[in-house]
């Protein structure tokens, strides 16, 4: 089905009869609907995202502004149609493809320590977003949403304050700013891996109910997709593929339309830059000390998002949304997860199975004083992370360390936050250095 993430995306049908619309001119970008910001999970799990919930509207508006900017500058491989323009979408959309941003993490960590007799408050904000391109089709009277391309975005920021702790308003500003920065710095580069192209065929046989279309090859096509019938280079109707052969397809035609042999048809293909699809499917915490500091159900989704983000930076890697966290249903042919829209409605999205499932294991953490004198203590921190990719027969343990010099009786720190920050750095190292 979608194992190679090569999905021919077929244009939406105009109701027949209607005025013919011009075929897309050479060089003109295809249209994709931008459907806004979703939340990973369902109505029961919304409460796990307190920072997002109190910033839902502000975050949505800020990300929308950024998406409009890159769209207006022509930096994307397609033209975005925004949700406020849905009437225009119905008339102009060339395919069933949509783009959405999904919030998957909104973590805030804080620690206080003393430096030269002054209390310092450190705040860490971790924003996790996954961008998804998905195809929507009507199957048995219901919309079926299938993710065909995705990539993570991570906003990770630290802030140091004096004796006064960071307020909720300041945290909110840091949260939104980090999300916008992550989007601005990555969206164009990562969407550049997507190409939309046209494929053409010719009607060889036709009746009042169906037409047989010679497409040369049907590799990658699927039943249920749409094709446009063209006359004099203009769209005049759209039909649905109901049967596929090796080189041809049988297309159901709309009532009142009579295709003729020799008539041209057109479809729009979406292709990702790689057939190598990865997905973090598991994060374990096998270290007892690490488990006391970082419960698996909390650190797992965070580490999965970080690793996925850094792995995406490696050329040619298509990284599916992490299966760690959220609401997932798994089957032999793929997985499905639930998202919540801005109105609180739940939507089900399907995902093809990855070619390379990835497992992570936090195997150890360590912190100890390595040097000491009358004035200072030198503390060493170390974290170990194992990466396993069974389909590649690959397994390797990575480690990272850091040190902190503290003035005795004056400076202090919180061990957990030092190790948390080091784990973030280690996921980057592991993703970038893994021999895959």
Kindly label every feature range from the protein language model.
Residues 19-25:
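Sec/Tat signal peptide C-region and signal peptidase I cleavage site
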Residues 27-105, 141, 230-232, 283-285, ...:
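N-terminal segment of the mature soluble domain
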Residues 6-17:
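Bacterial N-terminal signal peptides
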Residues 100-162, 356-413:
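Amphipathic beta-strand/beta-sheet edge segments enriched in Tyr/Trp
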Residues 25-27, 140-209, 214, 244-247, ...:
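C-terminal/domain-edge helix-coil "capping" segments
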Residues 215-221, 255-259, 349-351:
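Short, surface-exposed secondary-structure edge patches
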Residues 216-244:
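Ser/Thr/Gly-rich low-complexity blocks that favor extended beta-strand/coil architectures
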């Amino acid at each position: 089905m979608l194992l190679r993430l090569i999905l021919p995306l077929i244009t939406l049908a105009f109701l027949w009869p209607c005025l013919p619309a011009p075929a897309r001119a050479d060089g003109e970008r295809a249209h994709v609907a931008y459907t806004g910001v979703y939340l990973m999970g369902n109505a029961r799990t919304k409460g796990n995202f307190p920072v997002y919930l109190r910033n839902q509207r502000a975050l949505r508006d800020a990300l929308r502004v950024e998406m409009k900017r890159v769209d207006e500058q022509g930096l994307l491989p397609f033209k975005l149609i925004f949700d406020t323009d849905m009437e225009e979408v119905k008339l102009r959309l060339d395919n069933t493809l949509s783009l959405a941003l999904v919030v998957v993490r909104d973590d805030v960590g804080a620690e206080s320590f003393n430096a030269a007799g002054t209390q310092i408050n450190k705040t860490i904000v971790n924003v996790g977003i996954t961008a998804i391109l998905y195809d929507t089709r009507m199957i048995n009277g219901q919309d079926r949403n299938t993710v065909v391309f995705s990539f993570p975005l991570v906003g990770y920021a630290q802030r140091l304050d004096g004796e006064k702790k960071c307020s909720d308003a300041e945290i909110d500003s840091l949260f939104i700013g980090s999300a916008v920065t992550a989007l601005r710095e990555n969206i164009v580069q990562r969407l550049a891996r997507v190409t939309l192209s046209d494929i053409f065929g010719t009607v060889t046989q036709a009746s009042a109910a169906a037409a047989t279309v010679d497409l040369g090859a049907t590799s990658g096509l699927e039943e249920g997709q749409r094709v446009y019938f063209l006359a004099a280079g203009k769209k005049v109707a759209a039909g649905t593929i109901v049967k596929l052969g090796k080189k041809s397809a049988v297309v159901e035609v709309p009532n009142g339309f009579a295709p003729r042999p020799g008539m041209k048809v057109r479809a729009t293909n979406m292709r990702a830059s790689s057939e190598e699809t990865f997905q973090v499917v598991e994060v374990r915490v096998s270290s007892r000390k690490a488990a006391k500091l970082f419960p698996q159900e909390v650190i797992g989704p965070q580490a999965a998002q970080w690793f996925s983000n850094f792995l995406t930076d490696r050329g040619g890697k298509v990284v599916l949304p992490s299966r760690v966290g959220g609401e997932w249903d798994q089957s032999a042919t793929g997985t499905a997860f639930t998202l919540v829209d801005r109105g609180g409605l739940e939507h089900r999205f399907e995902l093809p199975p990855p070619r390379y499932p990835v497992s992570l294991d936090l195997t150890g953490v360590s912190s100890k004083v390595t040097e000491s004198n009358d004035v200072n203590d030198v503390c060493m921190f170390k974290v170990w992370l194992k990466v396993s990719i069974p389909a590649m027969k690959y397994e390797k343990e990575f480690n990272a360390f850091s040190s902190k010099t503290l003035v005795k009786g004056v400076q202090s720190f919180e061990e957990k936050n030092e190790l948390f920050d080091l784990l973030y750095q280690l996921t980057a190292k592991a993703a970038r250095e893994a021999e895959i």
